[in-house]
């Protein structure tokens, strides 16, 4: 009797010991799984924040481009590319300007005014040529305005080089107003469609990247929940 009881006790002890070992293994697996889930959750949160930050930055870039580049592009009326032939290029007069010489320091100087008249091939009109749209805003009498500096001789030398280039290449492309309201043409568009495309390309890529990151994280979370439900059903 004593021997039988001792054997039973020993067997029960071994069974309890095995169960304790299995329980420890299971607890360890659950702990590892929780750690893995926590790490994945933190990584997913960071990925979502990165995607949202990319989208916010792209929206801010769209806003800045919209009030600067896109606005100037839409306001420009010189949209038709044409051919111009030089009629006359000459320095007519000088104008006063001011340049910065340091913090809260401005000095007066002068720049020569170059006037270039061209013949617009499509209409045969004699029109004044401007370098860019900004040239008209600075001084409507000058086709080309050099940067204001303290050395007038350098400005004069630069304008002479530009004038000689016009006389050398008398046939060139220019941009005119297709409506004919502006009696002038420009040589170079500051904001062409090509510049506009390249300026909007990178914010669009950033927006697409942010949306893709958020979508992939959400898809991963959905598939994870779906797999968990399937495993529960199979059990």
From Swiss-Prot:
**UniProt GO MF annotations:** calcium-activated potassium channel activity; ion channel inhibitor activity; potassium channel regulator activity
- What are the GO cellular component annotations? plasma membrane; voltage-gated potassium channel complex
Q: Where in the cell is it found?
A: Membrane
Q: Which residues are glycosylated?
A: 88, 96, 119
Stretches assigned to the Extracellular side: 68-194
The keyword Glycosyltransferase belongs to this UniProt entry's keyword annotation: no
At the top level of its lineage, which domain of life is listed?
Eukaryota
- Could you describe the post-translational modifications of this protein? N-glycosylated.
Sorted UniProt keywords: Glycoprotein, Ion channel, Ion transport, Membrane, Transmembrane, Transmembrane helix, Transport
Give the matching InterPro entries. Answer: K_chnl_Ca-activ_BK_bsu, KCNMB2_ball/chain_dom_sf, KCNMB2_ball_chain_dom
Task: List all membrane-crossing ranges.
Answer: 47-67, 195-215
Location of the region described as Ball and chain in the Swiss-Prot/TrEMBL record: 1-45
Give one Pfam family: CaKB
Q: Which GO terms describe its biological process?
A: action potential; detection of calcium ion; neuronal action potential; potassium ion transport; regulation of vasoconstriction
Membrane-related topology note: Multi-pass membrane protein
> What residue ranges lie in the Cytoplasmic compartment?
1-46, 216-235
- Similarity comment: family membership: Belongs to the KCNMB (TC 8.A.14.1) family. KCNMB2 subfamily.
Stated role: Regulatory subunit of the calcium activated potassium KCNMA1 (maxiK) channel. Modulates the calcium sensitivity and gating kinetics of KCNMA1, thereby contributing to KCNMA1 channel diversity. Acts as a negative regulator that confers rapid and complete inactivation of KCNMA1 channel complex. May participate in KCNMA1 inactivation in chromaffin cells of the adrenal gland or in hippocampal CA1 neurons.
Record note on domains: The ball and chain domain mediates the inactivation of KCNMA1. It occludes the conduction pathway of KCNMA1 channels, and comprises the pore-blocking ball domain (residues 1-17) and the chain domain (residues 20-45) linking it to the transmembrane segment. The ball domain is made up of a flexible N-terminus anchored at a well ordered loop-helix motif. The chain domain consists of a 4-turn helix with an unfolded linker at its C-terminus.
What this protein is called in its record is Calcium-activated potassium channel subunit beta-2
């Amino acid at each position: 009797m004593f021997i039988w009881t001792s054997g039973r006790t020993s067997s029960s002890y071994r069974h309890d010991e095995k169960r304790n070992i299995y329980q420890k293994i299971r607890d360890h697996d659950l702990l590892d799984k929780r750690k893995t889930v926590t790490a994945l959750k933190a990584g997913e949160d960071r990925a979502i924040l990165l995607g949202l930050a990319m989208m916010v930055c792209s929206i801010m870039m769209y806003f800045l481009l919209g009030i600067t580049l896109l606005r100037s592009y839409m306001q420009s009326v010189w949209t038709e590319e044409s051919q111009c032939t030089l009629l006359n290029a000459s320095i007519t007069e000088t104008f006063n300007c001011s340049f910065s010489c340091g913090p809260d320091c401005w000095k007066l100087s002068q720049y020569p005014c170059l006037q270039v008249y061209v013949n617009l091939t499509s209409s045969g009109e004699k029109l004044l040529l401007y370098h860019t749209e900004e040239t008209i805003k600075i001084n409507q009498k000058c086709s080309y305005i050099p940067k204001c500096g303290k050395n007038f001789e350098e400005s004069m030398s630069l304008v002479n080089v530009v004038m000689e280039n016009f006389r050398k290449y008398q046939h060139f492309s220019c941009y005119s107003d297709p409506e004919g309201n502006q009696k002038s043409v420009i040589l170079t568009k500051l904001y062409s469609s090509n510049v506009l495309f390249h300026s909007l390309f990178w914010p669009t890529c950033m927006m697409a990247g942010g949306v893709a990151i958020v979508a992939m994280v959400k898809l991963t979370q959905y598939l994870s929940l779906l797999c968990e439900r399937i495993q529960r059903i199979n059990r």
